UniProtKB/Swiss-Prot annotation:
Example of a GO cellular component annotation carried by this entry: plasma membrane
Species assigned in the record: Mycobacterium tuberculosis (strain ATCC 25618 / H37Rv)
Cofactor names: Mg(2+); Mn(2+); thiamine diphosphate
Miscellaneous information on this protein: Was identified as a high-confidence drug target.
Domain of life (superkingdom): Bacteria
Name of the molecule in the record: 2-succinyl-5-enolpyruvyl-6-hydroxy-3-cyclohexene-1-carboxylate synthase
Any GO molecular function: 2-succinyl-5-enolpyruvyl-6-hydroxy-3-cyclohexene-1-carboxylic-acid synthase activity
A Pfam family recorded for this sequence: TPP_enzyme_N
GO biological process: one example: menaquinone biosynthetic process
Keywords of this entry: Magnesium, Manganese, Menaquinone biosynthesis, Metal-binding, Thiamine pyrophosphate, Transferase
InterPro entries xref list: MenaQ_synth_MenD (IPR004433), THDP-binding (IPR029061), Thiamin_PyroP_enz_TPP-bd_dom (IPR012001)
Quaternary organization: Homodimer.
Length: 554
């Protein structure tokens, strides 16, 4: 067995021992030893391998798999620009704290700076965006040192896993694992009985790292009129379940007192408990920045949770005293009902179909056990405004840096992970539904994510709903959408594209239909085999008018 083959097999074996069950592989020559080792592991049922030709979509597929499974996922590629194409996914994984392992092959380091083909200084390329940049030295053709090299390689792989999962830091995130490989890059003919240098007995990792606990209790008096703001990455806090809570769609639903974000300006809370990292609603940002309202920030990680500079204290969990006033709870419940009614009434009265109408229809069609993946622009905001009840529903969205890139691939990865978990614990004949709601720009931006080869795992029940208003609808609601700029904003912010969504899907052999918004519910209830796209035409020119009408109705 040649040195590169041996090293690759050891690394793959140790990754599996450390909990990796899915790997995304992009083709290349330099990473051939890793590719052969991964294919062997896939054939033996130890991992599920997903082959993609585009590293950009591969990175987001890995993110979807990781957030769907709650486990580390590797994406493997060759050297050069293949590594650079992981940049956006690495940044998202950093801020969303996703255990993404970038497993890159490299040329031998002595070739750096010599003009060697497809060679660049890729170790350290991701800088501060990764939890660690770890390299293995070149494998040596030294049979007498096999045991020592095996220990070194396995220990380094365990270090990668610990950094990615946050086992020693409580801060999961991306890791760059760079492996220089020397030719030969393909396996040699092997003598009978050739074996990979062994790991620990019973399939255990070489170096076990128990997860660290991160516990900072914070005393909070609940007799003061309090609202909870629950954002992305929020933990579950049962002792706060009785409080009125503005929960973003990706936040866990832990109480029976939801509070619509548009109800906040109608209330005068005396303090705020912030969970996770809120990213969506302007009324929330205004409240958190109010110097007259103390903010207590509870997070699950080490990042500083205070955008406005107004937090009075930070911790990880609340130690509560007192109880909320019944009159305060009643007032919040009434304002919540009022805000939901205002949105629904204005949606019914509005003469045109908008993205908010599409989001409301999707929200109404969901049922317990579904998984919902939301685009990072208007869709995630719209389902919140539509009053989505997330009980029994898993909601995913790339909120780390909230880019629209990679959303199709993220949805595919999340669907594959969710279905895989269901197959292991439930009935494999009835896969759970994953529904993705995204805008047309988000869809077009990552349309190459639809490319899944005929030999690759494909979701069994994924519906991608494309709310198509032919451009960037969110800008209609921002300063750029002010009528003063109407002569230029449509082109430079709205970016109309006139893409034929159906033709694009046909090019990738993906089923698609264009339907009306009132057909969404019945169509989603129809069982779909595999992956399909439902396109709903929407209008963005009246979005500003609709939102103004909702605000006036409040």
């Amino acid at each position: 067995m040649n040195p590169s083959t041996t090293q690759a097999r050891v690394v793959v074996d140790e990754l599996i021992r450390g909990g990796v069950r899915d790997v995304v592989l992009c083709p290349g020559s330099r990473n051939a030893p890793l590719a052969f080792a991964l294919q062997d592991a896939d054939r033996s049922g130890r991992i599920r391998l997903h082959v993609r030709i585009d590293e950009r979509t591969a990175g987001y597929l890995a993110i979807g798999l990781a957030i769907g499974a709650g486990a580390p996922v590797c994406v493997a590629m060759t050297s050069g620009t293949a590594v650079a194409n992981l940049g956006p996914a690495v940044v998202e994984a950093n801020y969303a704290r996703v255990p993404l392992i970038v497993l890159s092959a490299n040329r031998p380091y002595e070739l750096l700076g010599t003009g060697a083909n497809q060679t660049m200084e890729q170790l350290g390329y991701f800088g501060t965006q990764v939890r660690a940049s770890i390299s293995l030295g070149l494998a040596e053709d030294a049979p007498e040192r096999t045991s020592a090299l095996n220990a070194t390689w396995r220990s380094a792989t365990c270090r990668v896993l610990a950094a990615a999962t946050g086992a020693r830091t409580a801060n999961a995130g991306p890791v760059h694992f760079d492996i220089p490989l020397r030719e030969p890059l393909v396996p040699d003919p092997e003598p009978l009985g050739a074996v990979t240098p062994p790991g620990r007995p019973a399939g255990k990792p070489w170096t076990y790292t128990p997860p660290v606990t991160f516990d900072q209790p914070l005393d909070i008096d609940l007799s003061v009129d309090t609202v909870v703001i629950s954002g992305h990455g929020a933990g579950v806090h049962p002792n706060l379940a009785a409080l009125p809570t503005v929960a973003e769609p990706t936040a866990p639903r832990s109480g029976d007192n939801p509070l619509h974000p548009l109800a906040l300006p109608l209330l005068r809370p005396q303090q705020v408990i912030m969970l996770g990292r809120p990213t969506l609603h302007r009324p929330v940002s205004v409240l958190l920045a109010d110097a007259e309202v103390p903010v207590f920030a509870l997070t699950t990680g080490p990042r500083w949770p205070d955008v406005s500079g107004n937090s009075q204290a930070t911790g990880t969990r609340a130690v509560t005293t007192g109880a909320p006033r019944p009159a305060w709870l009643d007032r919040c419940a009434a304002m919540n009902r009022h805000a939901i009614a205002a949105v629904r009434e204005q949606l019914a009265a509005h003469p045109l179909t908008t993205g908010l109408h599409v989001a409301a229809a999707v929200s109404h069609a969901l049922r317990p056990g579904d998984q919902l993946v939301l685009g990072a622009s208007n869709p995630v905001r719209d389902v919140a405004l539509a009053g989505l009840d997330t009980r029994g529903i898993r909601v995913r969205s790339n909120r780390g840096v909230a880019g629209i890139d990679g959303t199709v691939s993220t949805a595919i990865g999340a669907a594959l992970a969710y279905e895989g978990a269901h197959e292991r614990t439930g009935s494999p004949d009835s896969p759970p539904r994953t529904i993705a709601l995204i805008g047309d720009l988000t869809f077009v931006h990552d349309s190459s994510g639809l490319l899944i080869g005929p030999t690759e795992p494909i979701p069994r029940s994924l519906t991608i709903v494309v709310s198509n208003d032919n451009g960037g609808g969110i800008f209609e609601l921002l300063e750029q959408g002010d009528p003063r700029f109407s002569d230029v904003s449509s082109r430079i912010f709205g970016t109309p594209h006139d893409v034929d969504v159906g033709a694009l899907c046909r090019a990738y052999h993906v089923e698609s239909r264009q339907i009306e918004v009132d057909e969404l519910g019945p169509t989603l209830d129809q069982p779909g085999a595999g992956m399909r796209v439902l396109e709903v035409k929407a209008d963005r020119s009246s979005l500003r008018q609709l939102h103004a009408a909702i605000k006036a109705a409040l």
